[in-house]
From Swiss-Prot:
EC number: 2.1.3.3
UniProt organism field: Lactococcus lactis subsp. lactis (strain IL1403)
Keyword Transferase: yes
Keywords: Arginine metabolism, Cytoplasm, Transferase
Binding site residues for L-ornithine: 177, 241, 245-246
Protein name: Ornithine carbamoyltransferase, catabolic
Biological or metabolic pathway of the protein: Amino-acid degradation; L-arginine degradation via ADI pathway; carbamoyl phosphate from L-arginine: step 2/2
Family: Belongs to the aspartate/ornithine carbamoyltransferase superfamily. OTCase family.
PROSITE patterns: CARBAMOYLTRANSFERASE (PS00097)
Superkingdom field: Bacteria
Length: 354
């Protein structure tokens, strides 16, 4: 008796062919699956077990911004998976300058199996996905940073063994892409995300509405507050990002506004978890914690500051997990790429997770 044929539809993955443009486009269970898959692939890497799920695939890496972690992570992840990554920087292609996003997408989609884009406009990355016909992965836009989120919550899960019920406090500019992504993703996964920032730098109503909608189902309690003591109380994770992005001009105003929100050891003690092993510090990097960079020296010269968003003491402390977090960019991006392009057998994802 011959075995029944299994059609492609029957073995198709719930992720196959999909783009990751923003966290909210996936279900909470799917985001959690990618977190766990990233942890699995990290274990395979550590044990030198091959996992060439993308053998023969070609991947375009489109960068409009400079990058250390995202570029390195996508490159090494693609190679580990057996794929060939091709870096195309701002000076290499005509995207948005001499050629429309639609035309560029159609051309690249005919040559590459998937596209990563790190740029500015969310609409641009959405148009790449719309017209290319291949999976597109958002490596960062002004609105969202979804690949960073898989790495971040991988790091949290590695350290605490679970996600639901934890409290993550982001301190700094609450209007940027990191704050947006953290409060939405945390609300999806049952993590209480507090944005601690001056009132003028709180997330938009639109972002808070998205977070609150997910929180209704997950039980998370998202919060935006300017009160540092209230915001950090009970925190398990204190998270920071740069106060001003490279190329922005409003440094003086932003530095003055955010200096009271610098992460210090005293702030960590305010959490109530500094001495019980239930507190870590995270930062998506780069960080201005000393004067060992050109920007650090410029900041010291202009504002008399040797540290900005985080003190060097905290950055180098026992709480610090930013380099573990940075390594996890590679493992998490590998999970995203393999799940959406690798023709893996993932017919469903469990709805219940910790």
């Amino acid at each position: 008796m011959t075995s029944p044929l299994i059609t492609k539809a029957e073995v198709n993955s719930v992720f196959q062919g999909r783009s990751l443009l923003a966290e909210k486009d996936f279900t909470p269970a799917e985001i959690n699956y990618l977190v766990d898959f990233g942890l699995h692939l990290k274990a395979l890497k550590q044990q030198n077990i091959p996992h060439h799920y993308l053998e023969g695939k070609n991947i375009a890496l489109l960068f409009a911004k400079t990058s250390t972690r995202t570029r390195a992570a996508f490159t090494t992840a693609a190679i580990d998976l057996g794929a060939h990554p091709e870096y195309l920087g701002a000076n290499d292609i005509q995207l948005g300058i001499k050629e429309s996003t639609e035309d560029t997408a159609r051309v690249l989609g005919s040559m590459f199996d998937a596209i990563e884009r790190r740029g500015f406009s969310q609409k641009e990355v959405e148009d790449l996905a719309k017209y290319s016909g291949v999976p597109v992965w958002n490596g960062l836009t002004d609105d969202w940073h979804p690949t960073q989120m898989i790495a971040d919550f991988m790091t949290v899960k590695e350290n605490f063994g679970h996600l639901k019920g934890l409290t993550l406090v982001y301190v700094g500019d609450g209007r940027n892409n990191m704050a947006n992504s953290l409060i939405v993703t945390g609300s999806m996964l049952g993590v209480n995300v507090h944005i601690v920032a001056p009132d003028s730098l709180h997330p938009t109503k639109e972002v808070m509405d998205i977070a609150n909608k997910f929180a209704e189902k997950s039980g998370a309690k998202p919060l935006a507050t300017s009160n540092i003591e209230e915001g950090v109380k009970g925190a398990n994770i204190i998270y920071s990002d740069v106060w001003v992005s490279m190329g922005e001009s409003n440094w003086e105003e932003r530095v003055k506004l955010l200096t009271p929100y610098r992460i210090t050891m005293d702030m960590l003690k305010m959490t109530g978890n500094a001495d019980n092993g239930q507190l870590i510090f995270m930062h998506c990097l780069p960080a201005f914690h000393d004067t060992e960079t050109e920007y650090g020296k410029e900041i010291k010269e202009k504002y008399g500051l040797t540290e900005m968003e985080v003190t060097d003491e905290v950055f180098r402390s026992k709480y610090a997990r930013q380099f573990e977090e940075a390594e996890n960019r590679m493992h998490s991006i590998k999970a995203i790429m393999a799940a959406t392009l690798g023709n893996l057998f993932i017919p469903a994802v469990p709805e219940d997770f910790k």
